């Protein structure tokens, strides 16, 4: 019989994609999500094939009410979206710490064997190496800047998870997503935000870019991301950390031009000051996950077309 898997944050953008993939793989899945950022409609096509529990991971009683055996936990529940880093730093840290501790307590009580922790590229701040591998030093440049609540919470989660895993789990793995994009991801992220703003742009109106436009990112389509997660889920090694992304770099201004071209628009830019704490460049080293058989197939241009179609 296929293993029973609990996915926290399973109705979110990434969580729902992983949930659908595991259901297709004949796994028995429980989704635990309060739908504050997630959406039940993302799971509509498989709702009769999963068990959905609406709840907040900070509600320990609700979390521990999950019945029966759980073999594996995939922990994704968090608050994502850059604007929330600045607006809700306390809530982000509360979920990162108290929410995770509740999930780990459930693992201990149910004797869960395997745990996959979703971390983030936000743990890499001002990295020494580009592309950045998993051995890069993790740091918080400014504890007063609310932006780092997200990356700081992820670093705390990694520390808790690693040492809990050594004591209680058969397998503990961290995966660090890098700028995942795709249809229905929410408008708080750069690609859907740009698409929506382009559609509303009036003739001769300048397109606003935060920062210089020279900031560099590497994007991975959700379908390629799920393939990467699948490689980690099936072949990843205990106590290892894996980047999931591509090392194809693009500046934010070139990204805007690419989206405009796909939409058939001509644009002129208006640039403004960069948000404090926003990294100038982010690009993962993916040699480690490639050794598990990972290969990304969707170009950024084709990925944007998939969103629009």
Where are these regions (language model features)?
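N-terminal Rossmann-like NAD(P)+-binding domain of SDR-like oxidoreductases, especially those catalyzing
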Residues: 1-180
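A conserved pocket-lining segment of Rossmann-fold NAD(P)-dependent short-chain dehydrogenase/reductase
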Residues: 85, 138-147, 170-183, 195-220, ...
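Hydrophobic pocket-lining residues that define ligand/cofactor binding sites across diverse proteins
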Residues: 107, 165, 198, 232-233
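Short beta-loop-alpha junction of Rossmann-like oxidoreductase domains
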Residues: 126-128, 183-189, 288
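Hydrophobic alpha-helix immediately C-terminal to the catalytic Tyr-X-X-X-Lys motif of short-chain
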Residues: 156, 160, 164, 193-194, ...
